[in-house]
Design a protein with these regions (language model features):
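Asp-based, Mg2+/Mn2+-dependent phosphohydrolase catalytic module
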Residues: 54, 58, 74-177
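Conserved donor sugar-nucleotide recognition element shared by glycan-biosynthetic enzymes
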Residues: 9, 49, 107
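Structured helix-beta-strand junction loops
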Residues: 63-64, 160
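Metal-dependent phosphoesterase signature
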Residues: 17-55, 63
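Alpha-helical substrate-recognition element adjacent to the catalytic core
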Residues: 1-21
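Hydrophobic/aromatic residues within well-ordered alpha-helical segments
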Residues: 4-9, 33-37, 74
């Protein structure tokens, strides 16, 4: 499930249609499938944050760093839940979503947009990722990428990152050094 994480919903739907029906998806099909997917995710109920991610975010924020969300998702419920679960951490003007890019991950565009909008030099920025496509995107943008294994992937799946951590706690200990 993490293999396509980070891609825009449209690109996943187009690829699936090519594989299943040997043709591109029409705009109405993309809209319908995406709406059905969003409704399904909404039915799953409450989502829970990755263990100890709040500690990482609070540490990064307390160090004075900007925190950006770079996601291939266009689901407004996801963005709203980020604000509900992590109040005062995320700012809407520091989010790059599927609505902001032409090319999703693994293309560098999402991370390049966040970097450009941050106004910071690249050496002052880093990416925290949990999926291979996001790692590739961050690296292609010329950024340092830290990967945290949050699911079923192997360390090898995340090996393109500059450093791989087995948990948010491990990442937090590294960041505090």
């Amino acid at each position: 499930c993490y293999i396509n994480e980070g891609r825009t919903g449209e690109s996943v739907i187009r690829e699936a249609m090519l594989k299943a029906r040997n043709r591109d998806a029409r705009p109405d099909e993309i809209e319908q499938i995406y709406a059905e997917k969003s409704a399904y995710f909404h039915q799953l109920g409450e989502t829970y944050p990755i263990p100890n991610v709040a500690d990482v975010l609070q540490h990064v924020q307390s160090c004075g760093h900007q925190i950006w969300v770079v996601t291939g998702s266009g689901q407004r419920t996801l963005i709203d839940s980020l604000h509900a679960v992590f109040p005062n951490i995320f700012q809407r003007d520091r989010m790059i979503t599927a609505f902001d890019v032409t090319h999703g991950k693994p293309d560098p565009e999402p991370y390049l947009k966040a970097w450009e909008r941050s106004g910071l030099p690249k050496e002052k920025c880093f990416v925290i990722e949990n999926a291979p496509l996001g790692i590739r995107s961050g690296k292609a943008a010329g950024l340092t990428v830290y990967a945290v294994n949050t699911g079923i992937l192997t360390r090898e799946d995340l090996a393109q990152a500059d450093q791989v951590f087995d948990s948010m706690t491990e990442l937090l200990m590294f960041l505090k050094q």
